[in-house]
Amino acid sequence: MMFKQYLQVTKPGIIFGNLISVIGGFLLASKGSIDYPLFIYTLVGVSLVVASGCVFNNYIDRDIDRKMERTKNRVLVKGLISPAVSLVYATLLGFAGFMLLWFGANPLACWLGVMGFVVYVGVYSLYMKRHSVYGTLIGSLSGAAPPVIGYCAVTGEFDSGAAILLAIFSLWQMPHSYAIAIFRFKDYQAANIPVLPVVKGISVAKNHITLYIIAFAVATLMLSLGGYAGYKYLVVAAAVSVWWLGMALRGYKVADDRIWARKLFGFSIIAITALSVMMSVDFMVPDSHTLLAAVW
């Protein structure tokens, strides 16, 4: 029973979602030549760091979690694990994760993990989430760290491919998160969390969602245009972007914003999973010249 509680407080669903993106970034950079020990070290290292961040987040959010229907039954809210024990647990998870990334992968991968962790726990959870409408934007940077860590674990450098991955996953986080805030509007309102739909209104949030999906679409295409992924990835990226944008535009005419937002959120998971899979398997380009160079 205790094992289940210690697992729940790490938010395993979030860990799993991040692992998919780590694999995408890692295999994209590997280009078919996979270093399996490095692969395992990277996956486990990132998992532990994400788990640590989630436990710290649960500790920090105890007060607001009590006010939200979705989170009122979390382990720390119900007192199933003491706050002091959760801090020790989170610290041990983080230390183990950073050590694995440093010694098993490379220092760059570890530092990227540290930066993502500090942004999520120190900047987003401790301050921005409670005090600024821009909290989601800041949080998106930490959410984009895992695929970049996976990529840089292989390359050992932060190149344009890593920058494109950072852009793709950061931009994806915005409509994904705003959709959650719309269909969980009352929860965020009750907890006094200043997310965009609550502060500026759902109509404004819809405009932001549309613009971010357009920016996301452009960023996804850059992986192929920059010579990092192939034509199959390009086709899938274009298809999911167009479909997601179409769903966003239909939001201006819907009768029930909550139902629409749930569908938009659901497809966001499908979209980012499809991209992660495609960049994993379609990493080859036709020749040494990039598609972007061919266009010019």
Swiss-Prot record:
Gene Ontology annotations of biological process type: heme O biosynthetic process
Segments on the Cytoplasmic face: 1-9, 57-78, 127-197, 248-268
EC number in record: 2.5.1.141
GO molecular function: protoheme IX farnesyltransferase activity
GO cellular component terms, semicolon-separated: plasma membrane
Keywords, alphabetical: Cell inner membrane, Cell membrane, Heme biosynthesis, Membrane, Transferase, Transmembrane, Transmembrane helix
CDD domains: PT_UbiA_Cox10
Cellular compartment(s): Cell inner membrane
Leading EC class: transferase
Pathway it works in: Porphyrin-containing compound metabolism; heme O biosynthesis; heme O from protoheme: step 1/1
Reaction equation(s) it catalyzes: heme b + (2E,6E)-farnesyl diphosphate + H2O = Fe(II)-heme o + diphosphate
Periplasmic side: 29-37, 98-107, 217-228, 288-296
A Pfam entry, by short name: UbiA
Transmembrane segments: 10-28, 38-56, 79-97, 108-126, 198-216, 229-247, 269-287
Membrane topology field: Multi-pass membrane protein
Gene3D superfamilies attached to this UniProt entry: UbiA prenyltransferase (1.10.357.140)
Family affiliation: Belongs to the UbiA prenyltransferase family. Protoheme IX farnesyltransferase subfamily.
Note: Carbon 2 of the heme B porphyrin ring is defined according to the Fischer nomenclature.
Its biological purpose: Converts heme B (protoheme IX) to heme O by substitution of the vinyl group on carbon 2 of heme B porphyrin ring with a hydroxyethyl farnesyl side group.
Official protein name in the record: Protoheme IX farnesyltransferase
Organism: Shigella sonnei (strain Ss046)
